[in-house]
């Protein structure tokens, strides 16, 4: 069998995966979203109103720009939106050698898959000292009308980078919604970076199941006692390093151990 047919491919989310969500940068970006809405969305006059409008729409559309367009807010320039809401990466983010060491330990093609625009994603990677670690970046501009967790966004990623067997891909991500699609639709190896994002999604999921709440079809088959039951591995602490991965909880399969054997060997040598 040819080497390329057995090699693993590694796909990484950006926010909350390649840097800890507790860093505060993602929260600052969200605050700038609310400020942008006050400036550019008619009828939204305060940050509190913006947060309320954003909350329900984001849960449904999974990306702020799509959510705003769906609500009829289209009188602003997309480049201006991304530049304003994702600014200051070089001030907020800094290289973390232990995360770089983890990424470098993996032998195979490596890609970043993010719902933010690829231009701003690349700026963040430069700030993180990771820009030379990846074979490609796939972002909102590349996806067009779709985004994670929609299967069409994954299909577009695979097509762009000629990924022929998604089951030989490992997906590192802090969002259960996105991992769920990777697992159900493509049989990818899924690695959850457990952080505040997980808490937010579980809380939102619980709220959606209260009486009179709209059902969330994506959650219908989840284990009520453990919504993370489907993932292959859970990295706790919100930071992706060789050490944290070596302490990960490997859940239903050992595929994650096989796929990330190089990183685990690195842990045994430290």
Please place each PLM-identified region on the residue numbering:
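Active-site phosphate/pyrophosphate-handling residues
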Residues: 66, 101, 152
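Short, well-structured alpha-helical interface segments that form or flank functional binding sites
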Residues: 97-98, 177
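Generic anion/oxyanion-binding catalytic loop in active/binding sites
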Residues: 22, 88, 110, 142-143, ...
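N-terminal helical cap/lid subdomain that shapes the substrate entry/recognition surface
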Residues: 3-97, 117-119
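Catalytic-core regions built around general acid/base machinery
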Residues: 98-107
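Conserved phosphate-coupling serine/threonine residues in phosphotransfer and NTP-handling enzymes
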Residues: 114
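Proline-centered loop/turn at the N-terminus of a beta-strand
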Residues: 109-111, 189
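Asp-based, Mg2+/Mn2+-dependent phosphohydrolase catalytic module
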Residues: 1-7, 104, 117-270
């Amino acid at each position: 069998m040819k080497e390329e047919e057995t090699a693993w491919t590694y796909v990484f989310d950006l926010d909350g995966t390649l840097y800890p969500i507790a860093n505060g940068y993602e929260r600052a970006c969200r605050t700038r979203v609310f400020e942008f809405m006050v400036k550019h969305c008619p009828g939204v006059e305060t940050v509190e109103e913006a947060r309320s409008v954003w909350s329900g729409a984001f849960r449904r559309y999974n990306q702020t720009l799509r959510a705003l367009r769906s609500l009829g807010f289209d009188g602003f320039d997309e480049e201006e939106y991304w530049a304003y809401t994702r600014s200051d990466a070089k001030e907020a983010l800094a290289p973390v050698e232990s995360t770089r060491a983890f990424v470098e330990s993996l032998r195979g093609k490596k890609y970043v898959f993010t719902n933010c625009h690829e231009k701003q994603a690349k700026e963040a990677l430069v700030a993180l000292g990771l820009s030379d670690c990846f074979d490609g970046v796939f972002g909102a501009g590349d996806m067009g009308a779709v985004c994670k967790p929609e299967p069409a966004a994954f299909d577009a990623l695979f097509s762009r980078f000629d990924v022929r067997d998604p089951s030989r891909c490992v997906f590192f991500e802090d969002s259960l919604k996105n991992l769920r699609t990777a697992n159900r639709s493509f049989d990818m190896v899924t690695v959850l970076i457990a952080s505040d994002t997980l808490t937010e999604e579980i809380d939102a999921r619980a709220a959606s199941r209260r009486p009179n709440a709209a059902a969330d079809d994506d959650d219908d088959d989840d284990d009520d006692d453990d919504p993370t039951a489907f993932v292959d591995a859970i990295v706790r602490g919100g930071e992706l390093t060789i050490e944290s991965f070596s302490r990960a909880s490997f859940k239903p399969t050992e595929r994650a151990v096989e796929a990330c054997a190089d990183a685990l060997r690195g842990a045994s040598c430290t």
